[in-house]
Each structure stands twice: as structure tokens, then as C-alpha cells.
Amino acid sequence: IQSDYIYESFWGNEGRFTGLFLLLIYGLSFLIIFRLGHMKTEILEMFLAASLFVCIFGITDYLDLNLLHFKDRIVEEQYTIFTSTFGNINTYTAFVSLTLGLSSFLFATDGGGVKCFWHYICMLVAMAALITGQSDNAYLALMAMFGLLPLYLFRNWKGVKRYSVIVATFFTVVQIVDWISQH
């Protein structure tokens, strides 16, 4: 209403292409999902499985393998800001951050067994993908994860142990990515 470009502000056809209409759709989608949706663990597992493909393609892009040939027509100056199937590095980082947060939480709260191992693998790959994504937004996601997880996990000794495993895994992944980058 206060913009000089009311039409563009509503439809979002300029700048970052996010207008009031898109924000209303986001809000409406949230309300519908929140009111009518029932979270099932199968949905979370499917999300993690699909996320693994995105993360793996992001890691291979970091290694300049370009398996999907998405970067074949990108201008050389913009080559590093596009990755995986998402394109923009910040959108990719936001998605991988969701994957990392979910897999870390599920790993930390699992009782053990195959699901715990599956969530650990998802967490491991998501950590590597977040680091190789090379986005500044990754720092914010990591600070949120490592800052908020203890609030839930430190209620018992098992949570403290799992948090320690998560921290140790993260630093191990950092060392491995650094070693790969140097060779």
C-alpha cells in the first residue's frame, strides 16, 4: 500500500520475485498444513531420503563433478553460487539446514538400531553438504542447531552423549572436507 509500485509489490514480478500474493500463499499453506496435517514418521523418512540425493549432488558439485550437467550453461563468474538441484546456493543451504536439523534431532532422540544408524548417515551427509555448500548462511544454521539442541537433549545422560557424538561427527566431517579440499 505504501509502495510506489503497488502492482509489482502485490504480484512480486520485480526484484526477488516475492510479493504479497506469494506471502499470502505461504501463510495460507502454513495454516492448512497446521490445521489439517498430521505428521507421520514415514513423511519425515521420505523427506530425509529425498534430501540425501540433493545433498549428494551438492557435494559432487563442490568436487566439480557436475553429474547432472546443470552447470554446463552457467556463466563462469556465477559458477560457484549455484549448486545441486536447487540452483541458488542460499536456497540450497536453507534446505540442507532443515535436513541437518531434522536428522540430528532424530538421531539424538532415537532409541538405537537401524533407524538410529539411518539418521546418523543422513546427519553425516547433511553436515558434509552444508560445509561444501560454502554459504554464509550455514554458520547461522549451525549456531542454531548447536545452540538449541542442548536445550532439549541435556535433560538426561543419553542426550548429553548423543550431543557429544553430533559435535564430534561435525568436527570430523570438517577435517575430512578440509583434507579432500587440499588434495
Short names for language-model regions:
Residues 1-9, 62-66:
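Transmembrane alpha-helix boundary signature
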Residues 7-17:
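Short acidic, glycine/Ser/Thr-rich loop/turn "cap" segments at secondary-structure junctions
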Residues 15-182:
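Alpha-helical transmembrane segments of multi-pass inner-membrane proteins
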